[in-house]
Amino acid sequence: MMRFCQFLGMVMLATIGVRATPLCASETPGEIRPAKVEITGRGFEILEMRAKTVAFSMRPYVWTDVPAGIEGLLYTQMAGGGTATVHLKAKEAGRVFVAVAASQMLDLKEKGWMLPMPDRSNTFTYNDVHQTMMVILSRQVGEGEELDVLQLGWTGTIVLLPSDP
């Protein structure tokens, strides 16, 4: 039991040390500035992110608790439960931002996406019975880099785009 407690203490200390690492400027609250990308695929539309607008094309759910940092950005609206494919090509070096249901975020983290500490500036919800939380993740891309955006869960993975593509 003593060894287990020592191990648990080391894990907690390591976790605290990792969490204490400061985020880079583009990941700090209010600093969500997506790189310009060319986006292709199927099963999505490009719409403007606003609170109380329809979140998914096949359901009446609306976005709620939309942080100011993403209000007015464009995004890929999915059907919800559909099978969209999303491919992007960076027009410039920068960060690509996506949002997934919180229950899916670790799947993207394993694929190289940055997961900032969730807070109210990088999370939002839609008004289903569970008030499902969406978490924003990011990834650095170089100019000309191409990327297939993995679609996860019922919500899919939405891509946040600059308001002036």
Language-model features and meaning:
Residues 102-108:
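Extended, low-complexity, turn-rich repeat/linker tracts enriched in Gly/Pro/Ser/Thr and Asp/Glu
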Residues 71-87, 132-137:
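Non-catalytic, beta-strand-enriched accessory regions in extracellular/secretory proteins
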Residues 24-80:
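Glycan-recognition and processing domains
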Residues 15-22:
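C-terminal segment of classical bacterial N-terminal signal peptides
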Residues 1-9:
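Bacterial N-terminal signal peptides that target proteins for export
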Residues 84-95, 137-144:
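Extracellular and analogous surface-interaction loops
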